[in-house]
UniProtKB/Swiss-Prot annotation:
Classification of source organism: Eukaryota, Metazoa, Chordata, Craniata, Vertebrata
Binding-site positions, heme: C272
Catalysed reaction, written as an equation: an organic molecule + reduced [NADPH--hemoprotein reductase] + O2 = an alcohol + oxidized [NADPH--hemoprotein reductase] + H2O + H(+)
A GO molecular function held by the record: heme binding
Enzyme Commission number: 1.14.14.1
Protein name: Cytochrome P450 2C42
UniProt superkingdom: Eukaryota
Designated gene of the protein: CYP2C42
PROSITE patterns: CYTOCHROME_P450
Membrane topology listed for this record: Peripheral membrane protein
Keywords: Endoplasmic reticulum, Heme, Iron, Membrane, Metal-binding, Microsome, Monooxygenase, Oxidoreductase
Its biological purpose: Cytochromes P450 are a group of heme-thiolate monooxygenases. In liver microsomes, this enzyme is involved in an NADPH-dependent electron transport pathway. It oxidizes a variety of structurally unrelated compounds, including steroids, fatty acids, and xenobiotics.
Amino acid sequence: CDPTFILDCAPCNVICSIIFQNRFDYTDQDFLTLLEKFHENLNILSSPWIQVCNNFPALIDYSPGIHNKLLKNIAYLKSYVLKKVKEHQESLDINNPRDFIDCFLIKMEQEKHNQQSEYTIENLIATVSDMFSAGTETTSTTMRYGLLLLLKHPEVTAKVQEEIDRVIGRHRSACMQDRSHMPYTDAVVHEIQRYIDLVPTNLPHAVTCDIKFRNYLIPKGTTILTSLTSVLYDCKAFPNPEVFDPGHFLDESGNFKKSDYFMPFSTGKRICVGEGLARMELFLFLTTILQKFNLKSVVDPKDIDTTPVANGFASVPPFYQICFIPL
């Protein structure tokens, strides 16, 4: 099967459970429409045209179709979130918050006399929209790319499954406490993120004040694009960086080895706020899949191409077929 749909649904429902309290059925039309909008936006943002427009914004006026589609999808998401917020306002119990929206609304009520408060309906909608946009496609794309790499490298998959059998077994679910006892699996998750280099140029940021850096004056308001590729593929930190090798995160004794050059979530004050959740999802999704299934490719592993089909905002893996064989 093509794993795209199921790998889209799982992380999106995790976000839904945090924001809305409830999970969606995978046939729910609202849920499917949300997934469609997220998928379209990732493909648009990863297209060469968008990268050209980033450098020459005036071109948007001459060919606005894709740009308008992106904005229309964002507007749909915000209108959907607003509808959910209004439903929460009608049923809010300040003594019994159910989810993120409730907690935000309670904080709004507590600060309603503070004119400088950041807790506003507009910021709530923006925050929830950001959580969806940043927390759904990124995790699902990483998982989709990760399974492709495991198909390409069955020897790596076998080692992960051996560690799962030894630490977790077959009769209980994986939990985050297991990760510290599974250095090889932890290394594989890290190497997947390093190797795929999901967001090569990071998210654009703006300088908040004039700053001098290495004899360059960077004026306030300047847009900054940082190259995460330069650290994730640094040959001093990761020998043979073009090779998928979990050993990049293992020491000579087979223990997990941290690296200061591992920053797929960026770094500093503006690091991805969803890093903790994404790390948990990737570990738990991967171990659960490999605990329950063997992976089989429909082609010879040597013939699997892992080159991204789009490499603009995000590195998007090629579509592929995979067989999940129950253990």
